[in-house]
Each structure stands twice: as structure tokens, then as C-alpha cells.
């Protein structure tokens, strides 16, 4: 039978402006409406608002629309405090007041736990901080625009790879924010601007850190101007080479004083962005674990010892386990720095079976987990075998927390407490803490 060519059908996008009513926010902070019974996502729209939209995407199961005009605003709508908010992709909830942001994040956490773990629980009080000047580290992109012959220093534009030039970031720690105009001016006069990669700014308790990612060797003139800038501003300066290695140029090694312990770190190490929330988070985790002086505690995904060292002040002994060997070495250094002798750190791939590891033979009634966004798949299935009776799970991804909760519930744990940690105000990103207790 002959087969004839048939052109593919192309669905035309209706670009007329259309009014819709926003029902709620989705977990990413976009307004959710329904257009012909199909979910429609609208960035910048709030629950209860009547808005005018233009379709930008129309799939079989969902659609996306651009907010054209707010016809009937929500009482929770506020004017963004940042001049770059409309373009910058760093924040996505500045148009929603703080109470509304916190309510939305708590609601999102509750809904995910009900949907994927079948757990409904009244949330503990949220852990919050000041909503401006809270970021103690940031990575800013650098791009040389050949057409305009100008350097762009800032953050990615919303849903784009383009750079929004930023000279003021109100959520950045004030002493870091103050560097932006002069840093932009310095790098705009760079001899080879096309070789600039990115800049990282970090606020330690003893110093501010500047890291410059540069492709290829610096010429002497640029190197001198950079070191002069660091000296004038009393900065610790690092260069990041093409292989990703850090080269310390000048200044003190940075550290943070966290919950009574001094944590030395390198700019490549993970530290929590929001110092105030981190301190409250650590205190709450210790309170929920209820550690006694006779107990051995296990800290999984321990990093530099953010939880490990405070735990060691309450327990008989603490074991910290981390996947990155360099972090293990630095955590061990931090324990010595703080004269804490009842901790031991180990490197291990926590996706594998750990029950036969030497450190696992101690058995631990109390366990703390603080995994990355991928969650604790692998090790979470082994907690009952490790002797756990009480588990605090700190999560930066509620979806993987909900998934891992299913494993804990199947091992005979019950979810006793659940709370939201507002580590990143004015963004839809939420962190959370859950307490699981072994039944019986």
C-alpha cells in the first residue's frame, strides 16, 4: 500500500490577551489557573488575583502564560524592593509579602508530604530571619558583550542565559553588596575581559572573600590591579584556575563562628548561605534529637561539621560521615581547632551498604541527616539496621524528603515533627526539618 507524505500538524498558539483567575501558587511559586480545564502557570501572579495573560506555551497537559496586567490585585501583593527584580532570576517572590511567602512555603511542604508520603501533620513554627542582607555568599556571572563593548556582572535573567547587570543586591550581606559598584568598575577595565569567568563573594566572620574565575593566566597589569583592589578593601583573594583549583593569593583564611564552634572553610566548601537561619536550625536539630551525655550520635552528610561539633558538646561521642574526602579532612581540622576530642570523621559513599563499615558497628540511637538535593537514597534504608531510634532529617528538597520518608515509615518510624526553614527569603526555595521516632 502506498504511503503518502503528510505534513506534521502544528498547533497555533493563541496570543490574544485572556483574563484568568489564579487559584493558588504551585511549589515553584508560579500562579496556577485553569484555562479550559488545563493547568496554566503564570509567573508573578498571586492566589485570588484576576489577571490578563498571554499564552507563551501550550502543551497537551499544561500551558504557560505571561502576566500582562493585574486586573484585581491580591491584598498580599507588595511592590518589590529591588530595582532589578523584574529581570533578575535571583528572587521570584518579592511581589508577595513576607507572611504570604511563609504561608506558601509551609503549604507547599505540607502538600508534598501528604501527596508522596501520606503524612499529614501540623507544622512546627517556621525558622525565619531578616529578609534583606541575609546572603553571606553569592556567585555572580561575568560576560563580555562584544557588541556594546561592555562587561555584564550580575545574575542570570529570568528563564535566560543572559546576564542582568547588578550594582545593588539588597538580599546580599551589606559589606558584600557594597563591593559591587567598584568591582564592576575594576573588571570593566580588564585587559582580556573575554577571559573572565565568574566572581564569588563570601562573608566570613574574620574576612570577606573574593574569588575570581579566570580562563588562562592573568597578565601582570591585571593581577596587580586585582591585588590592589583586594588590599584596599581588606579582602582575602583567591583565583580559580581553569581546572577548578583554588589559588590563595592573599589575606586571612576565612572562618565562621557557628553555634559556639569555629568552622574554618575554603570558598569551594559548602556553608549555609543564611547565618541566622543556620544557627536556629542547628539549635532546633539538637533540641529535637534530645541527645544525652551517654549517647553515640551519627551525623550523615556532615560537611565541615556544622552539626557534628555542636552535637559533640552534648553526646559521649559523635561520628560524622561525608562523601567528599577534602571535606572530611577539613572537618577533622575544625574539631582540632575547637579542641573537641570526642568526634571522628569518615569518608564514605552513602549510597552504598554501610552496615559493615567499621564506624557503623557502634550502633547509634540518634541520627542526623543533612543531604544535598538528591536526598539520602541508599543510607536512609539502613538507619534501622544502624540502631536509630530518633532521626532528624534536614532537607533542602521537600520532594526527596517525602520520598525518603516512605523508607523511614516502612522501617517502623513515625513522623513526629515537621517544620519549614526559610533559608532563602523572597525565593520559592524552601528547606525543612523532620523528626522521625521509632515506634515502640
UniProtKB/Swiss-Prot annotation:
Q: So where does S-adenosyl-L-methionine get bound? A: 272, 301, 306, 322, 349, 370
Binding-site residues for [4Fe-4S] cluster, renumbered to this chain: 82, 88, 91, 169
- PROSITE patterns noted in UniProt: SAM_MT_RNA_M5U, TRAM, TRMA_1, TRMA_2
Q: Which SUPFAM superfamilies match?
A: Nucleic acid-binding proteins (SSF50249), S-adenosyl-L-methionine-dependent methyltransferases (SSF53335)
InterPro entries according to UniProt: 23S_rRNA_MeTrfase_RlmD, MeTrfase_TrmA_AS, MeTrfase_TrmA_CS, NA-bd_OB-fold, SAM-dependent_MTases_sf, TRAM_dom, U5_MeTrfase_fam
E.C. designation(s): 2.1.1.190
Q: Which residues form the TRAM domain?
A: 11-69
Q: Which UniProt keywords apply?
A: 4Fe-4S, Iron, Iron-sulfur, Metal-binding, Methyltransferase, rRNA processing, S-adenosyl-L-methionine, Transferase
* GO BP, sorted A to Z: rRNA base methylation
**Function as written in the Swiss-Prot or TrEMBL entry:** Catalyzes the formation of 5-methyl-uridine at position 1939 (m5U1939) in 23S rRNA.
Q: Which HAMAP family match?
A: 23SrRNA_methyltr_RlmD
What name goes with this protein? Answer: 23S rRNA (uracil(1939)-C(5))-methyltransferase RlmD
Which gene does this sequence derive from? Answer: rlmD
Amino acid at each position: 500500500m502506498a504511503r503518502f507524505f503528510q505534513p506534521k500538524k502544528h498547533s497555533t498558539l493563541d496570543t490574544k490577551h485572556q483574563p484568568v483567575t489564579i487559584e493558588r501558587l504551585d511549589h515553584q511559586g508560579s500562579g496556577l489557573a485553569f484555562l479550559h480545564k488545563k493547568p496554566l502557570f503564570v509567573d508573578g501572579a498571586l492566589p485570588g488575583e484576576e489577571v490578563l495573560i498571554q499564552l507563551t506555551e501550550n502543551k497537551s497537559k499544561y500551558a504557560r502564560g505571561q502576566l500582562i496586567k493585574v486586573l484585581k490585585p491580591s491584598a498580599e501583593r507588595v511592590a518589590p524592593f529591588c530595582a532589578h527584580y523584574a529581570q533578575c532570576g535571583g528572587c521570584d517572590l518579592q511581589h508577595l509579602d513576607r507572611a504570604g511567602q511563609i504561608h506558601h512555603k509551609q503549604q507547599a511542604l505540607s502538600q508534598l508530604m501528604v501527596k508522596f508520603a501520606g503524612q499529614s501533620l501540623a507544622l512546627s513554627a517556621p525558622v525565619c530571619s531578616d529578609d534583606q542582607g541575609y546572603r553571606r555568599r553569592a556567585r555572580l556571572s561575568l560576560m563580555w558583550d562584544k557588541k556594546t563593548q561592555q562587561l555584564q556582572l550580575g545574575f542570570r535573567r529570568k528563564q535566560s542565559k543572559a546576564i542582568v547587570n547588578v550594582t545593588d543586591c539588597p538580599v546580599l550581606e551589606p559589606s558584600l553588596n557594597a563591593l559591587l559598584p567598584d568591582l564592576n568598575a575594576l573588571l570593566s577595565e580588564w585587559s582580556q575581559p573575554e577571559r573572565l569567568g565568574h566572581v564569588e563573594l563570601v562573608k566570613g566572620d574574620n574576612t570577606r572573600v573574593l574569588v575570581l574565575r579566570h580562563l588562562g593566566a592573568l597578565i601582570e597589569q591585571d593581577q596587580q590591579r586585582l591585588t590592589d583592589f583586594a588590599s584596599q578593601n581588606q579582602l582575602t583573594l583567591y583565583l580559580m584556575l581553569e581546572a577548578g583549583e583554588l589559588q590563595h593569593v592573599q589575606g586571612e583564611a576565612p572562618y565562621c563562628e557557628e553555634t559556639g564552634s569555629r568552622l574554618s572553610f575554603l570558598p569551594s566548601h559548602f556553608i549555609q548561605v543564611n547565618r541566622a537561619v543556620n544557627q536556629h536550625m542547628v539549635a532546633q536539630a539538637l533540641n529535637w534529637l534530645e541527645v544525652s551525655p551517654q549517647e553515640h550520635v551519627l551525623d550523615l552528610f556532615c560537611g565541615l561539621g556544622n552539626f557534628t561539633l555542636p552535637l559533640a558538646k552534648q553526646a559521649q561521642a559523635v561520628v560524622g560521615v561525608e562523601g567528599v574526602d577534602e571535606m572530611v579532612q577539613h572537618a577533622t581540622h575544625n574539631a582540632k581547632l575547637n579542641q573537641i576530642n570526642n568526634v571522628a570523621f569518615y569518608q564514605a559513599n552513602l549510597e552504598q551498604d554501610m552496615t559493615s563499615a567499621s564506624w557503623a558497628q557502634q550502633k547509634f540511637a540518634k541520627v542526623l541527616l543533612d543531604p544535598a538535593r538528591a536526598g539520602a537514597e541508599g543510607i536512609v534504608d539502613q538507619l534501622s539496621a544502624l540502631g536509630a531510634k530518633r532521626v532528624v532529617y534536614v532537607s533542602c528538597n521537600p520532594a526527596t524528603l517525602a520520598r525518603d520518608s516512605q523508607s523511614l515509615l516502612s522501617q517502623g518510624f513515625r513522623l513526629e515533627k515537621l517544620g519549614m526553614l526559610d533559608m532563602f527569603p523572597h525565593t520559592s526555595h524552601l528547606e525543612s526539618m523532620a523528626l522521625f521516632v521509632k515506634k515502640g
